[in-house]
């Protein structure tokens, strides 16, 4: 049976997962009466909620007697570690672009990697049923993007398909047709079958799966030879050492699941069970004369955060797992399948340093742990600094902002204050397209500020670029915070009197503790307030004169917003039911002593 391996590249929310749904339905993977639901590929609850793909997944369908392995890639640069490896398994890529938005920066990130690996591209312009869409302009924009990424002559000559995933059709022109058959025919026609060279077994491990029943499972493409069940093999590791072991069970992909087989031929993707201690990039080779394939590099982390046990006064109320041993085991387990993540012990026995690719990457991990019933405290995200050629260097990112013209000057002002440099400024209709080069540190907390200052109109995206010399200090949050003076339950009476001081993160009737951040001050500098004072019930006041209290509703903060909001001396308490911000040192006098000590040491 012939094989085609194809990866799908798309920006967040351009309809990649919907396209895969269509392919699965078209090739009758499901029985006609089977309930499937939408978003079949995004199996993780968090992925469905946010509409992003985090872990790459595989599906396989059979069309006209040819087996097509579909590989879904994460679109976000924070999961860059996933993307590169996954593309190694593919022979071609489907580049999916929104007919209105055109190619976006995250797409560019993945496409660049795909073109470097010499994959054959097919461009699919989706959502042509949307009003105001501009498929022809988008086609030209894609061509320019390919050209800017140094595509070869052959790659620039790419086939294009138009259609709507929602309505369920794709065609090689703008005329709607019955279904997505033209696209599937195109895949068979334009994507080359896997290139198989003669020789002994070689298979590179490009991705892994973990099951509590089978342990770690190695996934990759058999690039030559045949692998059989129970066959003795050599595992060639990235440092050149060779381990002799045995492939106990083999699985190939079928529909949405896996099917157990006795042998896998070259060119197909397979999952191997029973190999101990392997890493991404290792080669499974012949037992007698092993030959290694070149290793793959995984993107380095650019950010770190301190994860510790929850040591607030409300500790242990909501969570099932609260000890440092629980947190440690969970983080170590996460590193087995989340490869861009590193965990180290810190000086303190109760906390761990976790390194990741960015705020989104770490935020997803914290959110997942929270839902599993963990309680933890996390500190402010720190950017990793490197020494290059004797200079202190920090990670820089390319920031792309699309914003209505009237706000463009505000955006440029905000970004340049945070040490960003403007490189590109173009007008697209009534929208200004701006591109900046800026330090990753400057991006922390920028999104919330940007949305406030542009009335929610700005669309921003960023991707890691390279390490460059340190840019100096970057201004953080301008305003101070409001801190609870003592533990208790907030009352409408006190919050009403304190409203002119700023806005709150709590409503009346919520429990607070000493040192917890309950709001933002209107001015710079922190202010300790008493939000839980009740009204004196003496007979001196008329009973009805102050019954009506108008309090502005609290501001809701998501986990990522909290991570960007807090400063050096603050942390976030994360439990299954609450996300609270607090000072690291809860007692006000202790905080003052510490601040004094710091200033004398600095002097």
Predicted region positions:
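P-loop NTPase switch module centered on the Walker A-proximal segment
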Residues: 1-103, 137, 141, 208-211
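Conserved structured catalytic cores and adjacent interaction surfaces
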Residues: 1-18, 77, 100-112, 118-120, ...
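Residue-level signature of catalytic and energy-coupling elements of molecular machines
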Residues: 13, 19, 51, 72, ...
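Interdomain boundary/hinge elements
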Residues: 35-39, 149-161, 194-204, 240-253, ...
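Canonical P-loop GTPase G-domain recognition
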Residues: 120, 130-189
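Conserved nucleotide-binding/hydrolysis modules and their immediate coupling elements
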Residues: 202-305, 315-317, 479, 488-538, ...
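Long insertion/accessory domains within large nucleic-acid-processing enzymes
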Residues: 253, 258-261, 438, 451-567, ...
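A short, contiguous, amphipathic alpha-helix enriched in charged residues
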Residues: 312-335, 548, 552
């Amino acid at each position: 049976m012939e094989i085609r391996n194809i990866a799908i590249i798309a920006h967040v929310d351009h309809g990649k997962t919907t396209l895969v749904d269509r392919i699965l339905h078209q090739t009758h993977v499901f029985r006609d009466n089977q309930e499937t639901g939408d978003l079949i590929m995004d199996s993780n609850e968090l992925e469905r909620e946010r509409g992003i793909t985090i872990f790459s997944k595989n599906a396989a369908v059979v069309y006209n007697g040819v087996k097509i392995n579909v590989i879904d890639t994460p679109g976000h640069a924070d999961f860059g570690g996933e993307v590169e490896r996954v593309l190694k398994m593919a022979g071609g890529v489907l580049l999916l672009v929104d007919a209105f938005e055109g190619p976006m920066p995250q797409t560019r990130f993945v496409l660049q990697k795909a073109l470097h690996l010499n994959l054959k591209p097919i461009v699919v312009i989706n959502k042509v049923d949307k009003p105001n869409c501009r498929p022809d302009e988008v086609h030209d924009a894609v061509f320019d993007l390919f050209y800017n990424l140094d595509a070869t002559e052959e790659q620039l000559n790419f086939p294009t398909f138009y259609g709507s995933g929602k309505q369920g059709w794709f065609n090689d022109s703008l005329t709607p047709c019955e279904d997505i058959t033209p696209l599937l025919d195109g895949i068979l026609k334009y994507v080359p079958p896997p290139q198989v060279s003669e020789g002994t077994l070689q298979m590179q491990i490009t991705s892994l799966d973990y099951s509590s029943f089978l342990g770690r499972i190695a996934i990759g493409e058999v690039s030559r030879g045949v692998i059989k069940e129970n066959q003795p093999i050599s595992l060639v590791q990235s440092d050149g050492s060779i381990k002799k072991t045995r492939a106990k069970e083999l699985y190939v992909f079928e529909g949405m699941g896996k099917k157990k087989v006795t042998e896998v031929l070259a060119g197909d993707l397979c999952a191997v069970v029973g190999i101990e201690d392997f890493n991404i990039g290792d080669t499974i080779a012949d037992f007698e004369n092993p030959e290694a394939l070149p290793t793959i590099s995984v993107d380095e982390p650019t950010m770190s955060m301190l994860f510790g046990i929850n040591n607030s006064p409300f500790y242990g109320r909501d969570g099932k797992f609260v000890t440092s041993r629980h947190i440690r085991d969970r983080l170590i387990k996460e590193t087995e399948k989340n490869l861009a993540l590193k965990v180290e012990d810190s000086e303190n026995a109760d906390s761990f340093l976790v390194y990741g690719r960015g705020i989104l990457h770490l935020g997803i991990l914290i959110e997942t742990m929270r839902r599993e019933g963990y309680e933890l405290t996390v500190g402010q995200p720190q950017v990793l600094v490197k020494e290059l050629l004797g200079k202190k260097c920090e990670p820089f990112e390319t920031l792309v902002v699309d914003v209505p013209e009237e706000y463009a000057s505000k955006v440029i002002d905000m970004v340049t204050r945070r040490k960003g440099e403007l490189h590109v400024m173009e007008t697209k209709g009534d929208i200004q397209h701006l591109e900046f080069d800026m330090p990753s540190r400057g991006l922390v907390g920028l999104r919330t500020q940007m949305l406030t200052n542009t009335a929610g109109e700005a669309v921003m995206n960023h991707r890691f670029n390279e390490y460059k010399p340190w840019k100096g200090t970057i201004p953080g949050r301008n305003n101070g915070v409001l801190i609870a003076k003592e533990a208790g339950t907030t009352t409408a009476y006190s919050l009403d009197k304190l409203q002119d001081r700023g806005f709150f993160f709590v409503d009346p009737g919520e429990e607070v503790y000493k040192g917890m951040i309950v709001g933002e001050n209107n001015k710079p500098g922190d202010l300790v307030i008493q939000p839980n004072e009740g009204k004196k019930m003496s007979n001196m006041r008329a009973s009805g004169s102050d019954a009506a209290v108008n309090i502005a509703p609290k501001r809701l903060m998501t986990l990522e917003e909290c991570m960007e909001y807090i400063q050096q001396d603050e942390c976030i308490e994360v439990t299954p039911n609450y996300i609270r911000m607090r000072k690291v040192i809860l007692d006000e006098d202790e905080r003052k002593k510490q601040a004094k000590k710091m200033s004398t040491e600095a002097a």
